[in-house]
Amino acid sequence: MSCIIKTESEIKKMRISGKLAAEVLEMIKEHLQPKISTEDINQICHDYIVYKKKAISACLGYHGFPKSICISINDVVCHGIPSKNQVFKEGDIVNIDIAIIKDGYHGDTSKMFYIGKTSILSKRLCQVARESLYLSLKLVKPGIPLYKIGEIIQNYVESNNFSVVKEYCGHGIGRNFHEEPHVLHYKNKKNNIILKKGMIFTIEPMINSGNPEVKCMKDGWTVKTKDRSLSAQYEHTVLVTEYGCDILTWQKDEDISQKLVNIN
């Protein structure tokens, strides 16, 4: 497995792409209300990416994906396709996944949102998904084997009586949307690449309130939990630095530092 070490010039461009992707999530929050369609949200994000930020949606047309962002509601694990016929309801939990291209380089991030008041279970699931990502980010530094990321995520999620989806993983990112390495969200010691300064990849755990099994719908994209349980996901693009990592898609309202320094 060959992992691309980014040059300083590439890192500079990816900081810009990551910041832009994060800004889309910051912008869209106020628009997420009951009775708004997912296609409305898709169009708002598309216009912001293309016309305001002069960038490109990495999702639109990727292997035939028909929209500019992914919107996954409740039991949808990932790759939900926005539609005029799908409207938000009070109590929904929603993942919005943003991937953009700016000056030839990608930025990729996602987070969960609540539509109005939601259940205690929904909030707890989202909290554990977010915390599992943050715990893994605190591990990232040169010299760490990649499987440690999946190990800490799986241990934390399962200790909270939730389950980790194993069919989908994080990935290297740069000029290409998906590069090496594959970043698993569960422990697998075969995933033993040693992290090095200059690597850039996503960490994006998907966790379910029920069983971990998933199924792909007839549209070829939408992935749901088999048991119809709720699912939640958070995602960041991260750069391995000398002593830790920089979160390239950090958002202003996050309760974690943009720069995680792990000297010990």
Swiss-Prot record:
GO cellular component, one term: cytosol
GO biological process, one term: proteolysis
Pfam family for this entry, one: Peptidase_M24
Co-factor(s): Co(2+); Zn(2+); Mn(2+); Fe(2+)
InterPro entries, sorted: Creatinase/aminopeptidase-like, Pept_M24, Pept_M24_MAP, Pept_M24A_MAP1
Reactions catalysed: Release of N-terminal amino acids, preferentially methionine, from peptides and arylamides
Details of cofactor binding: Binds 2 divalent metal cations per subunit. Has a high-affinity and a low affinity metal-binding site. The true nature of the physiological cofactor is under debate. The enzyme is active with cobalt, zinc, manganese or divalent iron ions. Most likely, methionine aminopeptidases function as mononuclear Fe(2+)-metalloproteases under physiological conditions, and the catalytically relevant metal-binding site has been assigned to the histidine-containing high-affinity site.
Hydrolase as UniProt keyword: yes
GO MF term set: initiator methionyl aminopeptidase activity; metal ion binding; metalloaminopeptidase activity
Entry binding sites for a divalent metal cation 1: D97, D108, E235
UniProt subunit comment: Monomer.
Family: Belongs to the peptidase M24A family. Methionine aminopeptidase type 1 subfamily.
HAMAP family according to UniProt: MetAP_1 (MF_01974)
Protein name: Methionine aminopeptidase
Upper lineage: Bacteria, Pseudomonadati, Pseudomonadota, Gammaproteobacteria, Enterobacterales
